[in-house]
Amino acid sequence: NKTAKTTTTSNAKLTTSTNSSIGTTNVTEVTKNAMPSIVSITNMSVQEVQNFFGGTQKQESESAGSGIIIGQNDSELLIATNNHVVEGSSTLTVTFIDGKSVKADIKGTDSDKDLAVVAVPLSEIKDSTMDKIAVATLGNSDQTQVGDQVIAIGNALGYGQSVTTGIVS
């Protein structure tokens, strides 16, 4: 029976002072703990485009985004992402932290909220990959306040894993 680890990230607030950097250690620690839960998602889609002579032709395009492993049931790993990442897909591929890729299916979407959940069959994930990935423990957004520092971890523009910080406004 395959089971991904559970990753818990710190809910500690980042602190600053006039003589120190902005929570460098906390950002590093949170990032290190969260990375096994972050995936890259590649969307292959077929679109009709107009050619030079006014006719239409089908063209395959590729786009990329990121997701976070949010759950696991008896048969699949569940990943949250944005609807715009998976919209119009003919094929979805999820790439894990170890660089291994598997096909994924859309479980559900909400275009108004730009949310989607995709699933990867556990039977398609090698044991060596399962040992490296983790299900994220999500925080409580009701505890978030304006002015809190936040960390965004993802796959910016498909270039690989990226980290940035910001402030809730």
What are these regions (language model features)?
Residues 20-29, 48-78, 100-105, 134-137, ...:
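A conserved glycine-rich beta-strand in the N-terminal activation segment of trypsin-fold
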Residues 41-44, 72, 83, 107-109, ...:
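Residue-level recognition of beta-strand microenvironments
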Residues 2-52, 66, 90-91, 145-146:
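N-terminal activation segment of mature serine protease catalytic domains
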Residues 7, 121-137, 164-169:
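Active-site region of chymotrypsin-like
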Residues 48-62, 97, 109-113, 119-131, ...:
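Gly/Ser-enriched beta-turn/beta-hairpin loop segments
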Residues 74-76, 80-114, 122-123:
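Catalytic-histidine neighborhood of serine endopeptidases
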Residues 94-95, 105-107, 126-160:
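Active-site substrate-binding loop(s) of clan PA
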Residues 36-41, 53, 67, 77-81, ...:
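Terminal peptide-recognition signature
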